[in-house]
A protein has these predicted regions:
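Outer-membrane beta-barrel "beta-signal"
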Residues: 30, 339, 359-372
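Outer membrane beta-barrel
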Residues: 55-78, 84-199, 218-227
Length: 372
């Protein structure tokens, strides 16, 4: 009897073992089928492109990296720092921008594109849409629409909103550009720029606009710079092929971490004329400028200086002062507050005096901007 009981127990254990083995085998099969089904999905998951900076990811099925970004901005303005005849005491302006960047690795370096579309909405149901930038770059070359290298290479004119009350150069134009970086602090740029395209054509005077009709020669911009430690020196020149005049700018930057400052000077080859590289946002077509619009340009020279100080991780103070041979004085100061990442709140106040127009203007801006 004891032998029979032991035999039944052994048989029962054998059956349990078989059942367990069968269950395990079935689980293995189910797991394998699940992994096989998931494998294609895993390959379709987003892959990031760390080589080109944050935000880039591979377009599925390609070796091209894509980055989508932009910003939304709304601001209230009190008078106009650029115009002593501004009639509106206040106005409200809202803007949205969408940027799309791509990058693909090639034997000549990254092949990149940059596209930015802008939408603006102003007081009085006024709205506009435009292609702000659209360009292709490879191996130091850039072709398409971008800001003039006369501005881009030099770093514009300070960390304030109204930074170009004293005109510092053209923006948003077609160009063929080559930039060189030696890797030891030395850089250089040369650019052929479309003489008939720019967002600022009303700033160069009537003679300039008359000359654009049958003109096809490009403008030429060339510059060089050197950076060592906290100091950077850059020089650039631009030749306006329509007016057959130009301008040169030189700039020194100092960056000591929390504190940075710059000094930039410009020379106009003919102080009695406006040209694309020494123009004016104040001319006889839009304000109180005298009949000779050049009186509201640089004259023979202009200079800009500015400084920024990081008060704490979320608060930065900025200031800029500019003056011209034609006795235009502009001063601006603001505070840039970033309460959270990618959100900017920026109040600013400006003062401008136009000696030739016997006029001055106080102006203010309160800006809210979210970048993504």
């Amino acid at each position: 009897m004891i032998f029979l009981q032991r035999g039944m127990i052994a048989l029962h254990r054998s059956k349990n073992s078989s059942v367990q083995n069968l269950v395990v085998q079935n689980l293995i099969v189910i797991w394998s089928m699940w992994r096989a089904r998931e494998a294609p999905s895993s390959r379709r998951r987003c892959r990031f492109c760390d080589a080109y900076g944050p935000g880039y990811f591979f377009i599925p099925g390609t070796e091209t990296c894509l980055k989508i970004g932009g910003r939304v901005r709304t601001e209230g303005e009190w008078y106009d720092a650029y115009n002593p005849n501004s009639k509106n005491g206040t106005l409200w302006h809202t803007r949205a921008e969408l940027s799309v960047d791509t990058a693909t690795d090639t034997e000549y370096g990254p092949l990149k594109t940059n596209t930015v579309v802008r939408w603006d909405w102003n007081d009085g149901n006024s709205t506009s849409t435009k292609l702000l930038f659209a360009n292709i770059s490879l191996g130091g070359f850039l072709v398409g629409k971008a800001d003039s290298q006369y501005n881009n290479y030099m770093g514009y004119a300070g960390n304030v909103i109204n930074d170009d009350v004293i005109y510092d150069g053209p923006k948003e134009l077609n160009q063929l550009t080559y930039k060189y970086d030696a890797g030891n602090g030395f850089t250089a740029v040369i650019s052929l720029e479309d003489s008939n395209s720019s967002s600022d054509t009303s700033s160069y005077g009537g003679a300039w606009q008359t000359g654009t009709g049958n003109h096809y020669a490009p403008d030429v911009v060339a510059g060089a710079g050197y950076k060592t430690g906290a100091w950077t020196l850059r020089v650039i020149g631009g030749y306006d092929s329509i007016v057959e005049e130009g301008a040169i700018k030189a700039r020194v930057d100092a960056d000591f971490g929390a504190f940075s400052a710059f000094l930039m000077g410009g020379w106009n080859t003919d102080g009695d004329k406006l040209n694309k590289y020494a123009g004016s946002y104040l001319n006889s077509n839009r304000s109180a400028c005298p009949t000779n619009g050049a009186d509201c340009g640089w004259g023979d020279w202009a200079f800009w200086t500015g400084a920024s100080y990081q008060l704490n991780p979320k608060l930065q103070a900025n200031a800029q002062v500019a003056y011209t041979d034609s006795k235009i004085f502009a001063a601006t100061a603001n505070v840039a507050w970033r309460p959270v990442k990618d959100l900017l709140v920026e109040p600013e106040v400006s003062y401008t005096n136009w000696d030739a127009a016997d006029a001055d203007q106080w102006a203010g801006v309160l800006r809210f901007e979210r970048k993504f």
